[in-house]
Regions:
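Alpha-helical oligomerization segments
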Residues: 196-236
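An amphipathic, hydrophobic-aromatic interaction surface with interspersed Lys/Arg
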Residues: 1-71, 75, 79-104, 108-206
Length: 236
């Protein structure tokens, strides 16, 4: 068990904000929702971030963008300190807070806060930690073995069908809730680790060397060895 990742998972699940102080004022960086992520996405594009340098030397690249684009950085931080849709869409309030940040912080302060925001999305880290990436590979291989049969699938080409529709259909949430009321990390983890069931036909069971008309839940950790054995038997 990786204690730090477990702590990160708990913080993500409970949507715990990161707090900081500027002068006598306290602020919180709230986990971004899907709606906030879309707002920030436009500002990130304006920063002209060098993804290669950010991966190689995140502190240096973060310092650079804070020096070159302080106004945009302060707006990003300002947006990140609001939690609800009403405040996020209140442009005047966002700009007022951004102006306060610019007048009361150094480049180093901005870089430190921006680094926290940049590193807030730990979805891929969680996916690897829980072995969900391995499940994805297994399901992809099983999909190839099973083939398409007589079914055709359409849609899921954009975030509307892939994530928003998934959440609304599965949990009965409104689009407004999906956009503004659940963190982007939690939303992505619900999608990535959703339980699915794979039904094996008689022919497929014959190919896998398994009989008995079993329905195999490929997302159940207890079935991982069985699924791997099925794939191994088929490949062998």
């Amino acid at each position: 068990m990786d204690k730090q990742i477990e702590i990160n998972v708990s913080d993500a699940l409970t949507e715990t904000p990161v707090r900081f102080r500027i002068g006598k004022r306290d602020f919180s960086i709230y986990p971004p929702t899907l709606g906030k992520t879309q707002i920030l996405k436009k500002l990130y594009l304006e920063l002209d971030i060098n993804a290669g340098l950010l991966a190689l030397n995140p502190l240096a690249e973060t310092m650079r963008v804070c020096k070159e684009y302080p106004d945009i950085v302060c707006r990003i931080i300002s947006y990140s300190t609001f939690a609800d849709r009403k405040n996020l869409l209140n442009v005047e309030k966002v700009y007022q807070r951004a102006a306060f940040l610019k007048d009361n912080t150094s480049v180093e302060d901005l870089a430190t806060i921006l680094s926290v925001i940049f590193s807030s999305d730990k979805t891929e880290e969680f996916i690897k930690y829980f072995g969900i990436d391995a499940d994805r590979e297994q399901k992809a291989r099983i999909g190839k073995i099973k083939g398409e049969g007589s079914s055709l699938t359409f849609g899921g080409k954009s975030i509307y069908g892939l994530l928003i529709d998934f959440a609304c259909q599965r949990y009965g949430w409104t689009m407004d809730y999906v956009l503004w009321c659940i963190s982007y990390v939690n939303l992505n983890m619900l999608f990535a680790d959703a339980i699915t069931t794979v039904y094996l036909t008689d022919e497929e069971r014959r190919q896998f060397g398994k009989g008995g008309g079993t329905v195999v839940n490929a997302d159940d950790p207890g079935n991982k060895d069985l699924v791997r054995k099925m794939i191994s038997d088929y490949d062998g």
